[in-house]
UniProtKB/Swiss-Prot annotation:
Homodimer. A divalent metal cation binds at residues 166, 211, 266. Substrate binds at residues 136-137, 274, 283, 292. One of its GO terms (biological process) is pyridoxine biosynthetic process. It catalyses: 4-(phosphooxy)-L-threonine + NAD(+) = 3-amino-2-oxopropyl phosphate + CO2 + NADH. This is 4-hydroxythreonine-4-phosphate dehydrogenase. Its main location: cytoplasm. Its cofactor is Zn(2+); Mg(2+); Co(2+). The keyword NADP applies. It comes from the Bacteria.
Length: 330
């Protein structure tokens, strides 16, 4: 995997299940050093609340990466300014959440870490704290100086990328342009090759409108925007199928041929994927200068500290990040 064997993890909202999931990760050994960017007192208290053993080591960037045995983690300490109670949001800690994201992102940009894994944040309380925040994907893109990144969610058998992300449905048609599709598909194909080891990815592309526009009778975006964009990329050797109606495309006989599906908007593609693999799916940001994976669920405040939070998604996200590091280093 190379000399850089550290993955930084941000637990996210301190009152949510993020700290629980980190404590769960610590219960097994991993082939990389996990560095948790968080308040060590928070991690210790939550592990004690859950009855899980946890020993913390201070992060020392000058020392070689050291994978820890079960029950131990490395922590890059950032303290919460206000007390944390499991399940109870506190707007006073919203700046802390963003500070952990900034520190982790900057440390990936300077090469300290091979990948970043994010736990769930609560966007509402961050915005209530006076920090405009629409999501991890947009935040990391802006901080990394990338104008275009791609959100992709993945299960063991399905990958769904999005042409647009957190936009009102009314704004989607205007955001789907020939240029935007060219940029999104170029990033998608490049990262499937470089980070997933797929030499010639086959991408199935959804139409925007019902029945993919029905020959222009239900919208003309497929004729005037999507098909011309795909034809231009096909001429460069890209393996693209579509645009196809989404309700046709998301059938097993089509999906088994696809390395990834490109949906035009958030709620076109993600309900299918989450129905198939909720709790086991992973959110991946493509197009960043570093590897970033995330859980596919929210903060689940009602489960924080209860011992009932499922760690399947964060474990899958960590395993995928490790695999992506291997492919990138090949």
């Amino acid at each position: 995997m190379g000399s850089n064997q550290r993955i930084v993890i941000t637990p996210g909202e301190p009152a949510g299940i993020g700290p629980d999931l980190v404590a769960a990760l610590a219960q097994q050994a991993w082939p990389v050093e996990l560095v948790i960017c968080a308040d060590p007192a928070l991690l210790t208290a939550r592990a004690q609340q859950l009855g899980l053993p946890l020993r913390l080591h201070s992060y020392r960037p000058e020392q070689p990466a050291t994978p820890r045995p079960a029950g131990e983690l490395t922590v890059l300490a950032i303290d919460t300014p206000a007390p944390v109670a499991a399940g109870e949001l506190n707007v006073a800690n919203s700046h802390y959440v963003v500070e952990t994201l900034a520190r982790a992102c900057d440390s990936c940009l300077n090469g300290e870490f091979a990948a970043l894994l994010t736990g769930p944040v609560h966007k509402g309380v961050i915005n209530d704290g006076g920090l405009p925040f629409s999501g991890h994907t947009e935040y990391f893109a802006q901080r990394s100086g990338r104008e275009r990144v791609v959100m992709m969610l993945a299960t063991e058998s399905l990958r769904v990328a999005l042409a647009t992300t957190h936009l009102p449905l009314l704004a989607v048609p205007g955001a789907v342009t020939r240029q935007s599709l060219d940029e999104v598909i170029t990033i998608l194909v490049h990262d499937l090759q470089q980070q997933f080891g797929i030499a010639q990815p086959c991408i199935y592309v959804c139409g925007l409108n019902p029945h993919a526009g029905e020959g222009g009778h239900m919208g003309r975006e497929e004729i005037e925007v999507i098909t011309p964009a795909l034809d231009t990329l096909r001429a460069k050797g890209y393996n693209l199928v579509g645009p196809l109606p989404a309700d046709t495309l998301f059938q097993p006989k089509y999906l088994q041929q696809a390395d990834a599906v490109l949906a035009m908007y958030h709620d076109q593609g993600l309900p299918v994927l989450k129905y198939q693999g909720f709790g086991r799916a992973v959110n991946i940001t493509l197009g960043l200068p570093f590897i970033r994976t995330s859980v596919d669920h929210g903060t689940a405040l009602e489960l924080a500290g209860s011992g009932q939070a499922e760690a399947g998604s964060i474990k899958t996200a960590l395993n995928i990040a490790i695999d992506m590091i291997k492919h990138r280093n090949e």
